[in-house]
Amino acid sequence: MEYLVTMTTHVPDGTSAEAVQDIRGREAARSRDLAAQGHLLRLWRPPLQPAEWRTLGLFAADYDAQLEKILASMPLRVWRTDQVTPLAPHPNDPDLETREPGSPAAAAWRSEFLTTFTVTVPDGTPAGEVANTEAREADRARELAAHGHLLRLWRMPGAGRTLGLWHADNAAGLQAILASLPLRAWMSVQTTPLTTHPSDPAPASS
C-alpha cells in the first residue's frame, strides 16, 4: 500500500545549529536506508512560507502500523508532525514499465506537480454519458502517460477524490494538460507545485 505523508518539522527554540545539522545528516542517511528497503519512494518540497520546514513523502508499507514504525524510525520525527493520507490503486494509474527509454517520459522535465481532483457528476446526468466520459478519461490518461505528463494516479479517501503526479514545463503547461481531460468540467482541482528534495530517491531522469 502507498501513502502520501505531509511532514512538518518544528525545531525547538534554542536548538543549536550544530544539533540541527546533525539530525539532518542522520535523517538523510535514514532516508537512503528506507529507499533501499523500498519503503521511501519519493520526497518533494511543496511551497513554503519563510522559516517553514515541510516535506511531502510517498511511502510504501504493508499496513498502517508498519508505516508508523517506518516514520518513527526517522530522526526528525522527534521534531515533526506527520499527516498521513492512504492511497488506493486507481484504474487509470500509468504502468511506468511500459515507457520506452528516450521517450518524453524518460527525459528531464522542469517541474513536477501534485493534483487533487474531486469529481462531482451533475444531478440528472444519464448513466451512459457518465460511462462514456469516464472511458474517454481513461484513454486520455493513457495518452498523457505515453507523452510523459501523467506519472501516477491514486484514489484518495472520500467520494470522487483522486491524487495525481504530473510532469509539465510550468504551471501554465499543466493547466493546459488538465483542460484536455474529459472529466475536467465535473472536477475541482487543487494543484501543488513541487521542488526537488535533496533526499529524493527518484533518479533525476524519472
Task: Please report, for each region that a protein language model flagged, where it lies by residue.
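Conserved, structured core segments of small domains
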Residues: 1-206
